[in-house]
């Protein structure tokens, strides 16, 4: 049975995760997000037609030349389930690729994964986008923030990036690992607060990491059970949602009844274009 890792903070975990005890607030006060999200943010809006989801891109522009991408039209939105990878070294070549992406007629919005340069990502300014907070990479490219809920085509999307690198030791030794890949308690608290405001009900969930309880279905091992895994298990039990999309596993597979591992597929969130 899955043991909720949050219990180490305040004893037995409450039956409903969406009411946090004061002790948890005291423990995490020192980890308050230093970025003040408020009046400095500007709203970035627009209309869209279809919403699609794909998996880890790892900075590979050839993915945008695949036949699956041809279905995207002007005004559509492509959601990426982590490891976007096009913001890595700030090289001239990388800037040229980002310029190409910025010329797409559709919007690209991604949650972060484990293989990201978080120092560079955090240099982009925060804006309000579709009811939530995102980092503005380009006029049509947005980095979705952990725990935010976005309203797209009258549907609510809960986004939560980050996770744990399986190649942590190698990447740490080579200087390509960032501590920010692992969600903080403050980010989880913000997510719970936003879910509370929406009565623990969203339409779709976009993450990089899969819920740990799916490991047998996926044929992969979750070697590290971090706070994010406990949090996701409680979302499964406590939240109402239609579909949950995640990357990380580099496979395209549907796990009944609501889970979608995505990699190279470009899946429509809904079945048909209006």
PLM features per residue range, with description:
Residues 12, 19, 26, 36-40, ...:
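Short, positively charged and aromatic/hydrophobic N-terminal segments
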Residues 47-52, 148-159, 256-260:
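Beta-strand-turn-beta hairpins that frame and shape the catalytic cleft
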Residues 51, 77, 155, 203-204, ...:
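Structural motif
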Residues 54, 59-152, 221, 228-232, ...:
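Core catalytic region of metal-dependent phosphoesterases/phosphodiesterases
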Residues 57-58, 84-85, 114-117, 163-164, ...:
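Catalytic metal-binding/acid-base residues of hydrolase active sites
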Residues 107-111, 133-139, 212-274:
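Conserved beta-sheet core of the metallophosphoesterase superfamily
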Residues 132, 139, 152-223:
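Active-site-proximal loop/helix segment associated with metal-binding centers of metalloenzymes
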């Amino acid at each position: 049975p899955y043991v909720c890792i949050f219990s180490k903070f305040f004893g037995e975990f409450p039956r409903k995760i969406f009411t946090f005890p004061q002790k948890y607030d005291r423990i995490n006060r020192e980890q308050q997000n230093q970025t003040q999200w408020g009046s400095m943010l500007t709203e970035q809006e627009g209309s869209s037609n279809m919403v699609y989801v794909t998996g880890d891109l790892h900075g590979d522009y050839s993915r945008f030349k695949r036949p699956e991408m041809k279905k995207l039209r002007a005004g559509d939105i492509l959601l990426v389930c982590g490891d976007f990878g096009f913001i890595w070294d700030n090289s001239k070549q990388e800037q040229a690729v980002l310029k190409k992406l910025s010329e797409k007629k559709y919007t690209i919005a991604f949650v972060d994964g484990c293989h990201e340069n978080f120092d560079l990502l955090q240099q982009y300014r925060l804006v309000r986008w579709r009811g939530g907070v995102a980092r503005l990479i380009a006029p049509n490219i947005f980095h979705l923030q952990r725990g935010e809920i976005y309203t797209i085509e009258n549907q609510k999307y809960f986004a939560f990036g980050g996770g744990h690198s399986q190649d942590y030791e190698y990447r740490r030794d080579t200087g390509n690992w960032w501590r920010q890949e692992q969600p903080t308690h403050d980010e989880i608290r913000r997510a719970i607060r936003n879910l509370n405001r929406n009565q623990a009900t969203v339409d779709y969930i976009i993450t990089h990491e899969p819920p740990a309880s799916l490991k047998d279905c996926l044929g992969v091992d979750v070697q590290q059970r971090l706070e994010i895994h406990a949090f996701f298990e409680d979302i499964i039990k406590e939240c109402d949602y239609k579909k949950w999309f995640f990357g990380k596993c580099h496979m395209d597979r549907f796990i009944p009844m609501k889970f979608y591992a995505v990699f190279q597929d470009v899946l429509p969130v809904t079945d048909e274009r209006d």
